[in-house]
UniProtKB/Swiss-Prot annotation:
It comes from Rhizobium etli (strain ATCC 51251 / DSM 11541 / JCM 21823 / NBRC 15573 / CFN 42). It is found in: Cytoplasm. Residues 80-83 are annotated as: Involved in Mg(2+) ion dislocation from EF-Tu. This is Elongation factor Ts. The keyword Cytoplasm applies.
Length: 308
C-alpha cells in the first residue's frame, strides 16, 4: 500500500471539504488513490463531489472570435495576472483568436498559422512576445465550432476587454431562421453554459465513464440504507435520471428563466426565429481549468449579471 502523507491528506481535504481523519481513512481504504478516495468519501456521504474541476491556477486570458458561421475560443496562459492585464498581451490573445478562425481550430493548426502583424507563425510570435514581455506564455487550448446555416454565438464572462476574459463559451445553433433573433437566444444559452458547465448537450451524450462512476457512487450510497436489492436498483435508476437531467444542457433549468428547461426556452425562441433550432455544438473554456486555484461561483455571478 502507498504511504499516506500529510500532503495527500491536505490535498483530499481541499478537494472535498471532508475532515482530516475521514480523508486519512479514505486514502488508507483506497491505497492512496486520490480519485478513488474522493469516490469513497462521496459513497459514505462525507463529500458531495470532487471540487478540483472548478479550481484553477494558470493566469492569462481566454479569447473568442467569430466570422460568418464559425467561431473559436482560445486560451493563452501567462505566469502572472499582471501580464494578463498588459495591453500587448491582450492584443496578442485577441490576434491569435482572429487567426484561429481561419484554421480548423486545433492548437497545432493555430500555432502553425501565420500571425499577420509579425509575418511569422503564431508559435514564433509567442516566442517573440516572451522575449519582449519577459514572462513565459503559451497557447494552451483552442476550439472551433461551425454550422452550414445558423450562428455560432459567443460569450465572455466578466470581459476585461472586447472578446477577452477568463471564461469563454461558444454555442452552435443550426437554423434557417432570422439570424439576429437566433444570435440573441444563442447568447443567452452561452451565458447559461458559462454558469452551469454542462457535461453534454443531451443526456444520452454524457460520457459513459462519467455516468458509470456516478452510478457506482449511488449504488454504494443506496446500499447504506439497508434496503432490498430491488429497491436499491430503483433508487439508483431514479438518481441517475436526475443526474443526467442536471448535467445535460437541454434538460437543465434555464438560468435566465428557471421555470423553463433550456430545451423549452429554445423552443419558445423558435417563434421569433421563425424556424426550428438545433443545438449542434458547445464549448466552454475556463482559464487554467484543471489546475488548483481559489474557486469562483460562476453560476451566481452569471445569474446576477443576467438579472441586472
Amino acid at each position: 500500500m502507498s504511504e499516506i502523507t500529510a500532503a495527500m491528506v491536505k490535498e483530499l481535504r481541499e478537494k472535498t471539504g471532508a475532515g482530516m481523519m475521514d480523508c486519512k481513512k479514505a486514502l488508507a481504504e483506497t491505497s492512496g488513490d486520490m480519485e478513488a478516495a474522493i469516490d469513497w468519501l462521496r459513497a459514505k456521504g462525507i463529500a458531495k463531489a470532487d471540487k478540483k474541476s472548478g479550481r484553477t491556477a494558470a493566469e492569462g486570458l481566454v479569447g473568442v472570435s467569430s466570422e460568418g458561421t464559425k467561431a473559436v475560443v482560445v486560451e493563452v496562459n501567462s505566469e502572472t495576472d499582471f501580464v494578463a492585464r498588459n495591453d500587448a498581451f491582450q492584443d496578442l490573445v485577441r490576434g491569435i483568436a482572429k487567426v484561429a478562425v481561419s484554421t480548423n481550430g486545433t492548437v497545432e493548426a493555430v500555432a502553425a498559422a501565420t500571425y499577420p502583424a509579425s509575418g511569422k507563425s503564431v508559435s514564433d510570435t509567442i516566442k517573440d512576445a516572451i522575449a519582449t514581455i519577459g514572462e513565459n506564455m503559451n497557447l494552451r487550448r483552442s476550439i472551433a465550432l461551425s454550422v452550414e446555416d445558423g450562428v455560432v454565438a459567443t460569450y465572455i464572462h466578466n470581459a476585461v476587454s472586447d472578446g477577452l476574459g477568463k471564461l469563454g463559451v461558444l454555442v452552435a445553433l443550426k437554423s434557417t431562421g432570422d439570424k439576429e433573433a437566433l444570435n440573441a437566444i444563442g447568447r443567452q444559452v452561452a451565458m447559461h453554459i458559462a454558469a452551469t458547465a454542462p457535461l453534454a448537450i443531451r443526456p444520452e451524450e454524457v460520457d459513459a465513464a462519467v455516468a458509470e462512476r456516478e452510478r457506482n457512487v449511488f449504488i454504494e450510497q443506496s446500499r447504506a440504507s439497508g434496503k432490498p436489492d430491488n429497491i436499491i436498483e430503483k433508487m439508483v435508476e431514479g438518481r441517475m435520471r436526475k443526474f443526467f437531467e442536471e448535467v445535460a444542457l437541454l434538460s437543465q433549468s434555464f438560468v435566465i428563466n428557471p421555470d423553463l428547461t433550456v430545451a423549452a426556452a429554445i423552443k419558445e425562441a423558435e417563434k421569433a426565429v421563425g424556424a426550428p433550432i438545433e443545438v449542434a455544438g458547445m464549448a466552454r473554456l475556463l482559464l487554467g481549468e484543471g489546475v488548483e486555484k481559489e474557486e469562483t461561483d460562476f453560476a451566481a455571478e452569471v445569474a446576477a449579471a443576467v438579472k441586472g
